[in-house]
């Protein structure tokens, strides 16, 4: 008699354990996925990178960037990947952490301690500017 009760108890306990998928008090797991967002940017690079006067910056605003690197640099490719930006031409310069500078106030109003560049209107809130060309703000 004791053997039958023990067997029924063990079978019932195993069935109960198999029927409860989540730990006590934990909500069932939910998985939400969002489709990836990809931004494609077309930038044409100059044949050679030359320094141009700030007054000739006609492809966009003059920017003062903390860093200007090739699009193939590891830090730049990581950032482009995180932002979902795909470049069609990887032979371009990319400005990182850029702020607009005033070309009108050459001298005092155009202070840029880092790298002054002219970019092709492909900026992402100053975090990254694509298609940059170095400029000389003192010409």
UniProtKB/Swiss-Prot annotation:
- Show which residues constitute the signal peptide: 1-21
GO molecular function annotation: structural constituent of cell wall
For this UniProt record, give its keywords in alphabetical order, as a comma-separated list: Cell wall, Disulfide bond, Secreted, Signal
Q: Which InterPro entries match?
A: Hydrophobin (IPR001338)
Q: Where in the cell is it found?
A: Secreted; Secreted, Cell wall
The disulfides recorded in the entry are 57-118, 64-112, 65-98, 119-132
A GO cellular component annotation here is:
fungal-type cell wall
Q: What induces it?
A: Expression is low during in vitro infection of pine seedlings.
**Cited Pfam families:** Hydrophobin
Q: How does it assemble?
A: Self-assembles to form functional amyloid fibrils called rodlets. Self-assembly into fibrillar rodlets occurs spontaneously at hydrophobic:hydrophilic interfaces and the rodlets further associate laterally to form amphipathic monolayers.
Q: What does this protein do?
A: Aerial growth, conidiation, and dispersal of filamentous fungi in the environment rely upon a capability of their secreting small amphipathic proteins called hydrophobins (HPBs) with low sequence identity. Class I can self-assemble into an outermost layer of rodlet bundles on aerial cell surfaces, conferring cellular hydrophobicity that supports fungal growth, development and dispersal; whereas Class II form highly ordered films at water-air interfaces through intermolecular interactions but contribute nothing to the rodlet structure.
Instruction: Family membership, please give it.
Output: Belongs to the fungal hydrophobin family.
UniProt name for this protein: Class I hydrophobin 1
To which species is this protein native?
Answer: Heterobasidion annosum (Root rot fungus)
Question: Upper taxonomic classification of the species?
Answer: Eukaryota, Fungi, Dikarya, Basidiomycota, Agaricomycotina
Q: Which gene encodes it?
A: Hah1
């Amino acid at each position: 008699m004791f053997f039958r009760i023990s067997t029924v108890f063990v079978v019932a306990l195993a069935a109960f354990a198999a029927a409860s998928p989540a730990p006590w008090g934990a909500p069932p797991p939910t998985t939400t996925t969002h489709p990836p967002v990809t931004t494609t940017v077309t930038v044409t690079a100059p044949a050679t990178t030359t320094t141009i006067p700030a007054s000739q910056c006609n492809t966009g605003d003059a920017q003062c960037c903390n860093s200007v690197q090739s699009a193939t640099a590891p830090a730049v490719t990581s950032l482009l990947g995180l932002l979902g930006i795909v470049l069609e031409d990887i032979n371009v310069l990319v400005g990182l952490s850029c702020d607009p500078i005033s070309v009108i106030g050459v001298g005092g109003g155009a202070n840029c301690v880092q790298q002054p560049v002219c970019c092709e209107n492909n900026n992402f809130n100053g975090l990254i500017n694509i298609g940059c060309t170095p400029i000389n703000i003192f010409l």
